Design a protein with these regions (language model features):
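N-terminal Rossmann-like or analogous alpha/beta NTP/dinucleotide-binding catalytic cores
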Residues: 1-142
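Active-site cores that bind ATP or allylic diphosphates and position pyrophosphate for catalysis
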Residues: 98-99, 112-200
């Protein structure tokens, strides 16, 4: 009874961002187009749009649609999500990017990272145990040339799903194990609804 009579005041103020310059600001909303937006997504849309408007910035919709195995994209979801955002905010996003349309860009950056020895190919089955113990995987010692050759084979579809991945070379002593040599690219065999079998 007493609990029912208690009124709780909730702070619903959206706080200012510090050191933010007007007009030099972008926010990104990156849903996976495998369903309609949820209430949680809608909250993200509205907060991002609020900040974009407040600081005269851009609101960018980026469809994160490269996973055909875990969250297969649905063509209708691209359209529905865009409609939902227009309905929620009163206008279309300032820019719309589709990750699957940018695979060649991502491949180019991966090649550059490999050339700088900032990434490596790995097929360790026990990688999680190594990562959690901050132990380097044996593939970290592959040469730049070996890594580039393996990555080219990956792009050509020479490997099966789960056989090889491209990992970022990071700090193995990072406090959060998720930040240690995380996966940048992996092989997928399911066709993409927009790009088909163009990328593996």
């Amino acid at each position: 009874e007493r609990l029912a009579q208690t009124k709780v005041k909730i702070d619903r103020v959206i706080h200012d961002l510090t050191n933010m310059e007007q007009g030099n600001f972008k926010v990104r909303f990156a849903p996976n187009p495998n369903a309609s937006l949820t209430v949680g997504h809608m909250r993200g849309v509205l907060i991002n749009k609020y900040y974009a408007d407040k600081y005269n910035g851009e609101f960018v919709l980026r469809f994160d649609d490269t996973s055909t195995d875990v969250k297969p994209p649905i063509i209708k979801a691209y359209i529905q999500i865009l409609k939902d955002i227009k309905w929620l905010t009163g206008k279309a996003p300032d820019d719309v990017l589709i990750a699957s349309d940018r695979m060649d860009i991502y491949y180019d950056y991966a090649d550059q990272l490999l050339a700088l020895n900032g990434a490596y190919m790995c097929n360790c089955k026990n990688f999680k145990e190594l990562k959690d113990a901050s132990i380097p995987c044996p593939h970290r010692d592959l040469s730049v040339e070996e890594n580039l050759e393996l990555f080219n084979k990956m792009k050509q579809g020479d490997f099966e799903a789960g056989e090889w991945v491209l990992r970022a070379r990071t700090d193995l002593d990072a406090p959060n194990p998720a930040h240690r040599d995380f996966v940048l690219f992996r092989v997928q065999r399911n066709a993409h609804p927009r790009t088909g079998d163009s990328y593996k």
